[in-house]
C-alpha cells in the first residue's frame, strides 16, 4: 500500500503523510481511543478531496473527516485515511444578516466565528466546552451542543445547508455549511 500512497501523494496539491510520527499524532482525539490511521491527508482543494474519495473506493479503505479532534467519543479515530480539512478549509464565506445565516467552511473555529459575528450583533448559539478550538465541521458531524442547548439547541437545529462530497461507500466530507445565527 505504501507505493499506492506515494502515487496518490504525487497527484495532490495538499499533503499526504504516512510516516509513523504524523500517524501517531492523529491516532487519538480528545477521547481515550487510539488507533493508527493508514495515512493522514491535508487536502488543499476540492479536487484533492475527490481524489481521496476515488482512492479510498478503489483500495477499499475508509476516509475519516477531521477538524480539531476535540471529540470525546473517538469519532475521528480509525484505521483508514484521516482527512484533516482544518488547514485549508477554514474560511467564513458569506454573511446574510437580513436572513440570519452565515456560510462557512468546516475548519472555522466556533469562537472565531462568534468574534466575526459580534460586530454585527449576531452569534452562533451551540456551545461546547472546547468552543475556543472546536470547528464547525466537527460540530456538524457530532451534532454538538452544550450547557446552553436548552436555550440555543443543538448544531443540527441551526443547519440550513451542507455542501459535501459523497461516494457510494458512504463517505461524507463537508466542504461548506450554512448555519443560522441569532441576534444578541
Give a label for each model feature.
Residues 133-137:
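Beta-rich nucleic-acid/ligand-interaction surfaces
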Residues 181-182:
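Low-complexity, simple-sequence tandem-repeat tracts enriched in small residues
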Residues 8, 31-63, 85-128, 140, ...:
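N-terminal glycine-rich flavin-associated loop
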Residues 74, 130:
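Conserved PLP phosphate-binding loop immediately N-terminal to the Schiff-base lysine helix
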Residues 1-30, 55-63:
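N-terminal accessory segments
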Residues 34-35, 76-81:
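A short, glycine/Asx- and small/polar-enriched loop/turn
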Residues 66:
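Conserved PLP cofactor-binding pocket of PLP-dependent enzymes
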Amino acid at each position: 500500500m505504501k507505493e499506492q500512497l506515494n502515487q496518490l501523494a504525487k497527484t495532490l496539491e495538499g499533503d499526504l503523510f504516512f510516516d509513523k510520527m504524523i500517524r501517531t499524532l492523529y491516532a487519538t482525539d480528545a477521547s481515550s481511543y487510539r488507533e493508527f490511521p493508514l495515512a493522514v491527508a491535508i487536502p488543499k482543494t476540492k479536487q484533492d478531496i475527490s481524489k481521496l474519495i476515488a482512492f479510498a473506493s478503489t483500495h477499499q479503505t475508509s476516509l475519516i473527516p477531521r477538524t480539531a479532534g476535540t471529540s470525546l467519543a473517538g469519532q475521528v479515530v480509525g484505521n483508514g485515511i484521516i482527512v484533516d480539512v482544518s488547514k485549508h478549509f477554514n474560511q467564513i464565506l458569506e454573511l446574510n444578516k437580513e436572513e440570519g445565516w452565515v456560510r462557512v467552511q468546516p475548519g472555522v473555529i466556533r469562537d472565531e466565528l462568534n468574534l466575526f459575528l459580534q460586530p454585527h450583533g449576531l452569534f452562533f448559539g451551540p456551545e461546547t466546552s472546547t468552543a475556543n478550538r472546536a470547528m464547525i465541521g466537527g460540530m456538524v458531524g457530532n451534532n454538538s451542543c452544550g450547557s446552553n442547548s436548552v436555550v440555543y439547541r443543538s448544531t443540527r437545529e441551526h443547519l440550513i445547508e451542507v455542501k459535501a462530497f459523497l461516494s457510494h461507500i458512504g463517505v461524507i466530507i463537508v466542504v461548506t455549511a450554512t448555519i443560522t445565527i441569532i441576534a444578541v
